[in-house]
A protein has these predicted regions:
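Short, conserved beta-strand element in jelly-roll/cupin
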Residues: 34-36, 45-62, 100
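A short, N-terminal "cap"/entry segment at the start of jelly-roll beta-barrel domains
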Residues: 1-29, 42, 112-131
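Short, charged/polar surface micro-motifs in flexible loops or helix N-caps
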Residues: 26-28, 36-40, 59-61, 68, ...
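Short acidic-glycine-tyrosine-enriched beta hairpin
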Residues: 67-81
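Structural motif
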Residues: 52, 59-61, 68, 84, ...
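Ligand-binding loop in jelly-roll beta-barrel domains
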Residues: 81-107
């Protein structure tokens, strides 16, 4: 199959991994995330890529350049390149979301079960796509 077709809402809601790369193209990448209550992705800046988040479940806060916004299911967020940002899970259930990087950020097929595992990994997109 070319491209990616799937029930992204169900896939996101069923995902228990902190990070799971679903599809990597030349210019964008689709990643599922489940952030446990009280945890966060960690403050970061992408100098060379934009990032889109779609919240499918849970509650949280998104910080973009020092501005905090409360988020919940059905919210969408765009973080422009160069913006310092963080996503924090503030509810009693995991914050479940998918994110789209443009261009890709992670190695295709990456799965990190926990945030600790993700923090320990230092690999970045190596140019290899899903197809």
């Amino acid at each position: 199959m070319k491209g990616f077709v799937g029930d992204i809402e169900k896939l996101t809601e069923d995902n228990d991994d902190f990070r799971r790369v679903l599809y990597t193209g030349h210019s964008l990448q689709l990643v599922l995330m489940a952030i446990p209550p009280g945890e966060e992705i960690g403050e970061e800046v992408h100098d060379d890529r934009d990032q889109f988040f779609r919240i499918e479940g849970g509650k949280g806060e998104v910080w973009i350049d020092g501005v905090c916004t409360t988020v919940k299911a059905d919210d969408g967020i765009i973080v422009p390149q160069g913006a310092r940002h963080n996503v924090v899970s503030t509810g009693s259930e995991p914050l479940r979301l998918y994110t789209i990087y443009g261009p890709p950020e992670h190695i295709d097929g990456t799965v990190h079960a926990t945030s600790a595992e993700a923090s320990a990994a230092h690999e970045h997109f190596d140019g290899k796509t899903t197809e």
